[in-house]
């Protein structure tokens, strides 16, 4: 049973694929909890508990990993968000409906906090994931604990799901979203992505990454997944910009946010960039992300945009999907990242000159980090059980 001396905290995450931003967010929350409540019993519910344990298992001394809520969402007999949300709540109240996860359901009965951490995995792209919000709300109610969601990107919402999302959010004690469409949907104040809690951790200088050669001038992170523009169009736009900017190929570096997925666009242009460097996800995670204000970035990925801009780097964000990635990148532009947004790679004549404006003002990054820390204190404040 949870006690004030050893509370039970249950984090719902999408880490473990891996995808740089998802692991960055989870590691940030675990490091925060390790600093303030190292004695707490911490559980992380994710679709890939084994890989997640290997990636972030050292971030808190008492963290353990499971996949109960994700399994329940997958087990629901429909893709319809309303039916998934209803089914997982029935299963939590009647574990016989999902006997393979009985022990995990029992565990949820003693949690102090159920925290659905960011970012953008509860939306129309993955309609079953709305069950995570429903399960978190139901579990907290059953246990007499607190439900929180932070840094959520709920856009684009599944058709017809808006009333359900609003109703579920009203059952959470703490609700924070990271973009304007999500804030309008729930009629809540606009917040920021959870990665602001931990930006700067896991960063190294380019000189540390490449001690024996000049550092790259231009960094690329180019994804092939969820890419409505097409990998060939993205490849063509990037190659065009590099040539117009007169960047020597040996001063270009490609960074992976998702292993292999972020190699495919580069594979189309690497023969035109002899000497370009490749920095795999394993190095990003194990050695650190090489960042400096002297760099220029071209990124399709949201969290690489955020991390590089927070280090003061200039950049171009390519919005590879209008309803999803454009919303994500726009949220950072609205905060002052200073980057240039491109959402039409086919019109090469309109591609921008090399940006020189820099990234976020450091005072902005520090203010957003402090705001997130205050939110963290509210989420993990002691629970008064009736």
Regions found by a protein language model. Give the residues of each.
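Active-site anion-handling motifs in enzyme catalytic cores
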Residues: 1-386
């Amino acid at each position: 049973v949870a006690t004030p001396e050893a509370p039970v905290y249950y984090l719902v995450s999408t880490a473990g694929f891996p995808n740089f931003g998802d692991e960055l967010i989870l590691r940030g929350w675990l490091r925060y909890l390790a600093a303030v409540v190292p004695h707490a019993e911490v559980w992380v519910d994710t679709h890939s508990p084994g890989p997640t344990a290997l990636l972030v298992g050292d971030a808190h001394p008492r963290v353990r990993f499971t996949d109960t809520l994700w399994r329940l969402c997958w087990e629901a007999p429909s893709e319809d968000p309303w039916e998934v949300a209803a089914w997982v709540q029935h299963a939590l109240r009647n574990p016989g409906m999902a006997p393979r996860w009985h022990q995990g359901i029992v565990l949820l009965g003693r949690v102090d906090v159920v925290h659905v951490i960011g970012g953008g995995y509860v939306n129309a792209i993955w309609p079953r994931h709305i069950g995570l919000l429903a399960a978190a709300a139901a579990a907290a109610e059953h246990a007499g604990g607190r439900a929180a969601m932070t840094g959520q990107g709920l856009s684009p919402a599944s058709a017809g799901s808006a009333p359900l999302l609003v109703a579920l959010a009203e059952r959470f004690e703490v609700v924070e979203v990271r973009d304007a469409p999500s804030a309008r949907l729930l009629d809540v104040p606009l917040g920021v992505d959870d990665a602001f809690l931990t930006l700067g951790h896991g960063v190294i200088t380019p000189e540390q990454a490449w001690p024996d050669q000049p550092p790259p001038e231009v960094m690329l992170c180019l994804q092939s997944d969820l890419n409505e523009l097409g990998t060939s169009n993205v490849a063509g736009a990037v190659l065009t910009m590099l040539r117009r900017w007169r960047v020597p190929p040996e001063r270009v570096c490609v960074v992976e946010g998702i292993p292999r997925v972020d190699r495919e666009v580069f594979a189309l242009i690497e023969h035109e960039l002899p000497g370009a460097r490749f920095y795999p996800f394993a190095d990003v995670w194990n050695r650190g992300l090489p960042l400096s204000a002297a760099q220029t970035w071209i990124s399709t990925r949201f969290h690489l945009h955020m991390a590089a801009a927070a280090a003061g780097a200039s950049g171009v964000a390519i919005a590879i999907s209008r309803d999803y990635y454009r919303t994500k990148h726009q949220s950072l532009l609205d905060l002052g990242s200073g980057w240039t947004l491109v959402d039409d790679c086919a019109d090469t004549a309109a591609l921008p000159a090399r940006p020189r404006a820099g990234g976020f003002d450091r005072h902005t990054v520090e203010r957003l980090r402090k705001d997130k820390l205050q939110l963290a204190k509210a989420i993990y404040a002691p629970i008064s059980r009736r």
